[in-house]
Amino acid sequence: EVGDTVKVGQKIGEAAGFISAPVHSSVSGTVVAVEPRMHGTRGSEVMAVVIESDGKNTLHESVQPHKTLDELTPDEIIEIVKEAGIVGMGGAGFPTCVKLKPAKPVDTILLNGCECEPYLTADHKVLLEFADDIIFGLKAILKTTGAEKGIIVIEDNKQDAIELMQEKVANIGDMEVFVARTKYPQGAEKTLIKRVMGRKVPSGGLP
């Protein structure tokens, strides 16, 4: 409500259904309004909590360390992701927790490190600067989905990223790096699946 004090990581919006995610405050401060605001990717107004930051970035008490990945069960990992409100970055905001529990068996996870457009370097920089986080995340996905193998796909014009990720997976038996030709639209998911796995996703089907 208006006037409430909130902290970083505090839940300020509950998930309203299965295909939805909770919202958390990214700052500490005071709620100054609850009103419709333009959504960044939807192009329409949604109800928003407007917070005036106090500049302190004080963490909420609910933000606590979890058990190690080896100690967590697949269901516990999915619940953590769900409660954290993690969603995809493709614009639709699809809840990641739903993808971590596929309806059908999955044998391979493809980590798409190919840019979606020529001259972009977003995925390239993520691979270079967050390599350990990527490996950790892929381990978590393999555990929750039950997939036997994780393949990190990188275009051949990113040699430094290729070398770094190959070094990271060298002693991990269920991970490997696939070097793909730098060719548009290599980053499109169905194109990538056919290139790496030799499998064709049917028209209208989802990978």
Language model features with spans:
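Gly-rich Lys/Arg/Thr-decorated short loops/hinges at beta-loop-alpha junctions or inter-strand turns
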Residues: N57-E61, I109-D123, S203
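Histidine-anchored nucleotide/phosphate-binding helix
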Residues: L128-T145
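Short, Lys/Arg- and Gly-enriched loop/turn segments at beta-strand edges
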Residues: E14-S26, G40-S44, L59-E61
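Acidic low-complexity segments
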Residues: A33, M38-M89, F94, A103-K104, ...
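Short, well-structured beta-strand-loop connectors
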Residues: V2-E14, A33
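Conserved hydrophobic positions within beta-strands
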Residues: G29-V31
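Hydrophobic alpha-helical positions that pack around
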Residues: E148-P207
